[in-house]
């Protein structure tokens, strides 16, 4: 082989390697897309219904006032919702905040599903994450440059934790979903309630705090598991304050949320959502 052909062959090999690497780097995104498609197919067609006062009669007064305040009454009941948002994440207490963009699809019909896809950069290199919660279980996969797995976690602890997170999402993004019959309630006082979310696989509890404007301002739960540096799971109190209510897709919702681990040696704030680009309800209908 003479030099021109050798050079062309090398360029061809490099091009093929780059193509394969780019294709593989999108595997996690393709997996997310397939899981979302499967969830929509399993959900099937759901008849549109309007949320009325009668649908809320079993709820504690603070929750009823919250749903009225955000404008959920008179709107469609929610069976699924898609969220696109921007924020920041902190991988550990000592790291800097990194910008993230997330897209997630949640389903709250007969089958509970939460599919959360994250994009961020570290040292200028993209990192992709997929958090999957379905009837098959819960898992979290993170890939550096979309090629090298840096996080791969799954198990019952994650399923329990993600059940709490799904309940939190319903409060933050889709308050109309709080009429779900799988949620039972205990009113503690005029501005505080406990929500007990019982699924086919587990039962979790959260406490919701409201202010005098009937806004939900804080969500706490002691049923989420924190993964320490050794990879061990331990239950730790988890708090998500909400604020800056703004109109988003016809509802008055918090535009800022934060996720905080209340660890024994001090709070660890690890995630902030500052810009919710869009929320779309009942996408498959």
Outline where the language-model segments fall.
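N-terminal mature ectodomain segment of secretory-pathway/periplasmic proteins
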Residues: 65-148
